[in-house]
Amino acid sequence: TSEIANKNAHLLIRISDLHPATNEINLNFICPDWSLNRNPEFLYTLFVPDRASTTFPCFDQPDLKAQFKLQLKIPQAWKSVANRSVEKEEILDSIKTLNFKLTKPLPTYLFAFSAGKFDTISRTKNGKTCVLYHREKEEELHNNTDSIFSLLFHSIEWIEKYTGIPYPFEKYDLVAVPSFQYNGMEHPGATLYRASSLFLDAKPTQQQLLKRANLIAHETAHMWFGDMVTMPWFDEVWLKEVFANFIADKVVTPIFPEFNFDLQFLLAHYDIAYSVDRTSGANAIGQKLANMKDAGSLYGSIIYHKAPIVMRMLEQKTGESALQKGLQQYLSQNAYGNAGWQELIGILNTAQTDDLPRWSASWVQEAGRPHLKTTVDEKNMVIEQLDPFEKNRLWPQELDLAFSENGKITRQNIALNSIKEELKNVFSGGNPEWIYLNSKGKVYGFVELDSTSVHYFLNHFSSLTDDLLRASVLTDLTENLYENKLNTTEYL
C-alpha cells in the first residue's frame, strides 16, 4: 500500500511500485459529485464525452475499451439499473448491496448506472424482456406505456434484420429521467431518456408521435452504431450520430405511412445546414480534435444536419443493398471494437466503380457548399459548379434536373462529376418557362436560379402541386435571397 500523487488530473504511479510482467493496481477513492447528477430521490451518471475520469480514475478515450464490474450500496427502498443485470443482492441494516455482472467491452463514456425511487414496468416479446424505470403518475403511464414498448421492440427487431446481427448486449432497459439534459443517451442496458420525450399528453400531435418514435429508434440504433462499434476518437462523434439518424429514419418510415419523409427530411436538415455552410466560418463534418476536453465543441448544425444529407447521398451513390451489405460487414468486422468512416468507405469502395474516397474527401473533409448555375444556349445547356471560396474544389453529386416547355415538365438525372457539364439537345425549343436542378429536394448547395425561373416560381408558386418540389423551390429561392441573387421586394 502506498500513496499515489494526484497532479493535473493525473494519478502518478511510481516506477518502483511496478514490477516486470503483469501489474494490478487497486485504488481506494471517494467519487466526486460532478458527473453523478444527484437529486434528493435519485441519481444518474452521464459521462459523455470525457467525464468518467471525474468520477473514477480512467483514460477517457473511446478507443480504450474496458469491461466494468460494478458494486453499488444504496438505500433499501431504492432501485438501481446499470449496463448489466444484478448477479448478487444483499440487504444489511437497510442498505442494499448490488453486484452487477461484468460488461462487454465499453468506452468509458458508455459506462452507466442510475439509482433512486423509481417504479418499474416490464414487457416481454420473443423472449426479450425490457424494463422501464420511471417516476410518472398512473395517468401518464396509461396513455404511453404500450406505445413506448411497442416502438422499442419494433426498433430492435427492425435493426436486427437490417444488420443481420442480434441485439448485441444482455438487456435493454430504459430510464425516464425528469428534466434530463438531452432527449436521450444510449448507455447499453441503461438508456436514459428525458421523461417528457417519452410520456406525451393525452392527445399528442402526429409530429410529437413521430418525434418520440424517432428518438427511441435513434437511441436503439446506437446499440450497434456507437456502442458495439465505436469511433476511435471523438473527432468522429458525428459518425455515431449520422448512423443513428440514418437507421432511425428507416425504422419509423413504415410506422407512419401518412408522412412524406422526403419532405420531412428536407425541412428538418437543409435550412439549418445552409445557415452554417453559406458563411465564411463554415466547418467541415470531419474536424480535428487535439484534446478530449474540447470534444463538446464539435457538436453543432453541421454534425446533426449536413452529415445526414451526406449519408443519404452515400446510399444514393452506392445503392441501398450495397450500403446495407457494407454496413453489415463494417459491424461484424469490428464488433466490440473501434472503426471510423474511412473503414466504411474502404469496404464500400471495393464494390464501387466510382472513386468513393475522393467523393468522401469532398463532402466530409471540406467546409462549405458548391454553387450551381445553368446557362442555356438554344437547345443546349451548361451546368457549372463554382467554389464560393475560389479553391477550385469539386463536390460530386446527383442532380435532379426538371424543366417546363409549353407546360410540359421533363425530368432528367445528371451525375455531376466535373466543374462543368455540357448537355446537348436538352430542350426542344430553347425557351423553357423554368429550369431547376433540384426537383427532388436532394441536391446540396447554392442552386442559383436564372431570372426567367425566378420570375415563374414567384408568380406561379401556388400552382406547384408537388409538395416536395414546392418546398425545395422555396428553400432555394430563400438561398438566392441570402446570396444577393434575388431582391427582397421580389421575394416578398
Feature map (PLM): residue ranges:
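Solvent-exposed beta-strand/loop surfaces of large extracellular or lumenal domains
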Residues: 1-17, 36-43, 83-93, 398, ...
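Hydrophobic alpha-helical and helix-loop surface patches within well-folded domains
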Residues: 7, 100, 132-396, 406-408
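A generic structural signal for beta-strand entry/edge sites
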Residues: 8-12, 22, 93-99, 378-383, ...
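Short alpha-helical segments and helix-capping/turn motifs at coil-helix boundaries
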Residues: 10-12, 53-58, 66, 161, ...
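Preference for bulky hydrophobic residues occupying beta-strand positions
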Residues: 13, 27-29, 72, 132, ...
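Extended, low-hydrophobicity, Ser/Thr/Pro/Gly-biased non-transmembrane segments
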Residues: 17-19, 24-126, 133, 146-147, ...
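Short, glycine- and charge-enriched coil/turn segments that flank and shape catalytic ligand pockets
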Residues: 19, 88-96, 126, 140, ...
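Long, ordered, helix-rich scaffold segments
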Residues: 270, 301, 391-394, 406-412, ...
